């Protein structure tokens, strides 16, 4: 992982919080670095029981780390549920993949 990201995470964990708020922590990372970061947070959650609140656009990371997901579009909640539910919700698919057009 890039050193700056490691430092940011270490600084946040120094006080041994019960809740870790991560805001776009995957931004600017390559896919392999994102995978490393996901593994770090999964391990951290399992070993310490820390709650992680993730604000993120990298959906692969969101789906991998989350037990519960809330999806916002222009500040409005459009869906909420498990990653499995979110990945199949027509409202989410329409917002992020575009609506099907009649051909």
Predicted regions and their residues:
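Glycine-rich phosphate-binding loops of nucleotide-dependent enzymes
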Residues: 1-103
